Swiss-Prot record:
The modification Phosphoserine is found at S252. The lineage of its organism: Eukaryota, Metazoa, Chordata, Craniata, Vertebrata. This is Proline-rich protein 5. It comes from Homo sapiens (Human). GO terms for biological process: cellular response to nutrient levels; cytoskeleton organization; negative regulation of apoptotic process; phosphatidylinositol 3-kinase/protein kinase B signal transduction; positive regulation of cell growth; positive regulation of phosphatidylinositol 3-kinase/protein kinase B signal transduction; TORC2 signaling. It comes from the Eukaryota. InterPro entries: Bit61/PRR5 (IPR013745), Cullin_repeat-like_dom_sf (IPR016159).
Length: 388
């Protein structure tokens, strides 16, 4: 009896329940089909609007607002994740083909003039309109502007015979070509420096001189044999990995010791006889590094390169430890006989970094050098040391 009762309550669903489920499933399927059809219609409207912009047709009134709403709706659907791929593979590719077909077979000066006109149209009309149409997509990387400029670089700038046109004698380069190359070289891809970017740099070197590229400084006379100073400095720091990388802050040897001596107050001589008390302040002198060799002019080159009566205290770069208080500066050097050898700025930077690498505690500077004998008895404690 109990088994029969269980079978009675565990009976299969009735036909009426099946009839109710079939219309619900059909309704869901119809809703899905309608949403897909609406999304396809939105895709088509965006496609037609973008192609019309590349074809110089423009957009009708209120069309920009409709396209913005369509982009917002697509981003909420399952097709929103493929929006960037669709923008690159469909819209931008077709648009660049439209612009390229007009100048594809041009050469020489005609290519330069036609490419300049194409860039003006793209940069002034097409690019702002693309950013306006896809305004809801802003904030995502890569941006619409970056994608459009990269496609223009690959599909137009690097696909035409621009290098041959620039290499011709007496070629007149329009200002728009220079602007185009400079704007495009400022756009970078997420994967770093690519072969297309290096090809673009070779074009920039033909119209901009000097030009600091990825592999060094270039000019119209040819590439220099050395890179910029900043590059050597960064490579030096990355190899050493010592105090400069770990502790880039300025440290004092004693945190209780100030970097400069306090200002001393004393009365001037003869002030007591007059009955008036005039206080004068003695300013603490801080010894600075001598002028680097590479930046000093040899004697006999005008007023800027002529040495006066002041002798050169030291002929080398700034040492890691300056002279102490008791050691006087070198005297008796003949400025007319001593010719300072020239040194490039990068060698000066290397020498300074070597002096930093040799001492783990930092660069010690003694502020007591160069003081007069009358100042020593007033200041008392002498020069103080600090670490740079």
């Amino acid at each position: 009896m109990r088994t029969l009762r269980r079978l009675k309550f565990m009976s299969s669903p009735s036909l009426s329940d099946l009839g109710k489920r079939e219309p619900a499933a059909a309704a869901d399927e119809r809703g899905t089909q309608q949403r897909r059809a609406c999304a396809n219609a939105t895709w088509n409207s965006i496609h037609n609007g973008v192609i019309a912009v590349f074809q110089r047709k423009g957009l009708p009134d209120q069309e920009l607002f409709s396209l913005n709403e369509g982009v917002r709706q697509l981003l909420k659907t399952e097709l929103g994740s493929f929006f960037t791929e669709y923008l690159q593979n469909q819209l931008l590719t077709k648009g660049m083909v439209i612009l390229r077909d007009k100048i594809r077979f041009y050469e020489g000066q005609k290519l330069l003039d036609s490419l300049a006109e194409t860039w003006d149209f793209f940069f002034s009309d097409v690019l702002p309109m693309l950013q306006a149409i896809f305004y809801p997509v802003q904030g995502k990387e890569p941006s619409v502007r970056q994608l459009a400029l990269l496609h223009f670089r690959n599909a137009i700038t690097l696909s035409v015979k621009l290098e041959d046109a620039l290499a011709r004698a007496h070629a007149r380069v329009p200002p728009a070509i220079v602007q185009m190359l400079l704007v495009l070289q400022g756009v970078h891809e997420s994967r770093g420096v690519t072969e297309d970017y290096l090809r673009l740099e070779t074009l920039v070197q033909k119209v901009v001189s000097p030009y600091l590229g990825t592999y060094g400084l270039h000019s119209s006379e040819g590439p220099f044999t050395h890179s910029c100073i900043l590059e050597k400095r960064l490579l030096r720091r990355s190899r050493s990995g010592d105090v400069l990388a770990k502790n880039p802050v300025v440290r004092s040897k004693s945190y209780n010791t100030p970097l400069l001596n306090p200002v001393q107050e004393h009365e001037a001589e003869g002030a007591a006889a007059g009955g008036t008390s005039i206080r004068r302040h003695s300013v603490s002198e801080m010894t600075s590094c001598p002028e680097p060799q590479g930046f000093s002019d040899p004697p006999g080159q005008g007023p800027t390169g002529t040495f006066r009566s002041s002798p050169a205290p030291h002929s080398g770069p700034c040492p890691s430890r300056l002279y102490p208080t008791t050691q006087p500066p070198e005297q008796g050097l003949d400025p007319t006989r001593s010719s300072l050898p020239r040194s490039s700025p990068e060698n000066l930077v290397d020498q300074i970094l070597e002096s930093v690498d040799s001492d783990s505690e930092g660069i010690f500077i003694d502020f007591g050098r160069g003081r007069g004998s009358g100042m020593s008895d007033l200041e008392g404690s002498g020069g103080r040391q600090s670490v740079v």
